[in-house]
Amino acid sequence: MIIMRFLIKVKPEERKFRVPYNHQYFLQGLIYNRIKLTNPRLSTFLHETKGPKLFTYSLFMTERREHPKGLPYFLGYRRGFFYFSTCIPEIAEAFITGLFREPEITLWGEKFYLEEVKTLKEPKKFSGSTFITLSPIAVTMEKGGKRYDVSPLEEEFYALIRENLKDKYVMIKGEKPPDDFEMEIIAAKPKRFEVKPGIYQMAWHLVFRAYGDDELIRVGYVVGFGEKNSLGFGMVKVDEQRKRRKNIGSFQESMSFNENRELETGT
């Protein structure tokens, strides 16, 4: 499995710009639009195919920001950036080529210009590493014919993430998946997102450690943990700072971790 992971930097037209808190839908539109520019067939296939699309992306971040009270957006300054990851070369090639072909980008009414696309290095090891979300993790299950959001306080959360990883492993490798996977939640913060007009999703910003089969964990790192990765959920980075901190405390003690931590840059 090849990891194709990119940091995409954009320069705003204005010194100060808005970024709505519910913005994954706009990034999804950008990704599909640029893929369509260079590979219309692939764009149609991704639109029509059900199940995991085998790519994920982060929230849109800024080098500096302010949070005006009572508004549905924050104010960004300097550069904006986001991360994109896939294991499918055709998807990576189409999206990145499309960005360079049309470097002027309009998102939620703000204009940006492509400044840099940087290929990121792959961590050497995954099992035992600490991860932090770059976009929140979404997990759902069906009960009585309805789908419900599942939280890390429920046992099903962990089993569903493992089964989701195994399904993606089969899609990518075409072979029986390993079953060895555990995750230890260090900190968590719930977030409710409007993924499309009138459609909401409860998801979780997490700091967690993952243990088990390195290749199975690698699947989550490459194409996302949990569900709805192609809608902007489940992207993580390895948190280098926490590698040096062994006794951080229990899940319950860490529920109020700094929500800005997930917006730091990294691999």
UniProtKB/Swiss-Prot annotation:
- Marked site, Transition state stabilizer, at K53
Record's keyword terms, sorted: Antiviral defense, Endonuclease, Hydrolase, Nuclease, RNA-binding
**What are the BP-aspect GO terms?**
defense response to virus
Q: Active-site residues?
A: Y32 (proton acceptor), H47 (proton donor)
Would you identify the family this protein belongs to, as annotated? Belongs to the CRISPR-associated protein Cas6/Cse3/CasE family.
Q: Name one GO molecular function term.
A: endonuclease activity
Which InterPro entries does the record cross-reference, listed alphabetically?
A: Cas_Cas6_C, CRISPR-assoc_prot_Cas6, CRISPR-assoc_prot_Cas6_N_sf
EC number, UniProt record: 3.1.-.-
- Stated role: CRISPR (clustered regularly interspaced short palindromic repeat), is an adaptive immune system that provides protection against mobile genetic elements (viruses, transposable elements and conjugative plasmids). CRISPR clusters contain sequences complementary to antecedent mobile elements and target invading nucleic acids. CRISPR clusters are transcribed and processed into CRISPR RNA (crRNA). This protein processes pre-crRNA into individual crRNA units.
Record-given protein name: CRISPR-associated endoribonuclease Cas6
- Please name the top-level EC class of this enzyme: hydrolase
